[in-house]
């Protein structure tokens, strides 16, 4: 029977919006890889309690506020991991490697330069998404949608999800191509629709 492990992890940002990473010791499972700080839940602990304990033990910080970011299920050859990931909103203390591990503040755009355990890769993508993004409303015409997206980008939108079930496949495809050009270098475009259609943008 596959072993199951419940783990918590934290995305912690400093004032410069850099994200804290910790290097797994070489003598541990998946040693030498970078990870988001955290650890295993102990019996009777809630994920938030485990997170608070682990961050105090590992980093010497006390968290005051956090919110769920993502939950990840991942199967390794020898273990199934359930990973509850939280974004830490407020904490006290100066984060350091309290257990002797190397820690580093990393720019969000530089996360791709680091090697992570497979279960952490989904966290990397979630951490890089803007905290707020625009989802297009239904029941608008193509030109209304385009104008609204244009306005959202001018207002600083960094992630735009094109959700338009009212459009035909051809209308959606044409609009997506126009928005892809509009968003280039300014924002991420997320498409939501028929899988066969989305494959054309892969």
Residue ranges of each PLM-predicted region?
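Cofactor-binding loop segments of dinucleotide-utilizing enzymes, especially the Rossmann-like FAD-
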Residues: 15, 24, 137
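Active-site-adjacent beta-strand/loop module that shapes the phosphate/pyrophosphate-binding cleft
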Residues: 14, 72-94
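A short coil-to-beta-strand element that immediately follows conserved catalytic motifs
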Residues: 61-71, 87
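NUDIX/MutT-family hydrolases
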Residues: 85-89, 95-128
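Conserved N-terminal beta1-alpha1 strand-loop-helix module at the mouth
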Residues: 90, 95, 125-202
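Conserved Nudix-box catalytic region and its N-terminal flanking loop in Nudix hydrolases
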Residues: 18-58, 69-70, 188-190
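Conserved N-terminal beta-strand and adjoining loop/helix that marks the start
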Residues: 1-20, 71
């Amino acid at each position: 029977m596959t072993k199951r492990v419940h783990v918590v992890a934290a995305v912690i940002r400093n004032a410069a919006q850099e994200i804290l990473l910790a290097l797994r010791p070489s003598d541990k499972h998946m040693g030498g890889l970078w990870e988001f700080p955290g650890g295993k839940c102990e019996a009777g602990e809630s994920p938030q309690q485990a997170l608070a304990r682990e961050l105090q033990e590992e980093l010497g910080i006390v968290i005051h506020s956090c919110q769920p970011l993502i939950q990840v299920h991942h199967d390794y050859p020898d273990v199934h991991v359930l990973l509850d990931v939280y974004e830490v909103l407020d904490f006290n203390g100066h984060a350091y490697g309290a257990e002797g591990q190397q820690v580093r503040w990393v720019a969000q755009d530089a996360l791709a330069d680091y090697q992570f355990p497979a279960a952490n890769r989904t966290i990397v993508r979630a951490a890089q998404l803007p905290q707020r993004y625009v989802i297009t409303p239904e029941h608008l015409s193509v030109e209304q949608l385009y104008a609204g997206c244009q306005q959202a980008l001018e207002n600083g939108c960094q992630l735009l999800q094109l959700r338009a079930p009212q459009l035909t496949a051809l209308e959606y495809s044409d609009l997506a191509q126009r928005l892809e050009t509009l968003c280039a270098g300014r924002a991420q475009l997320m498409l939501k629709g028929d899988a066969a259609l989305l494959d054309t943008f892969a």
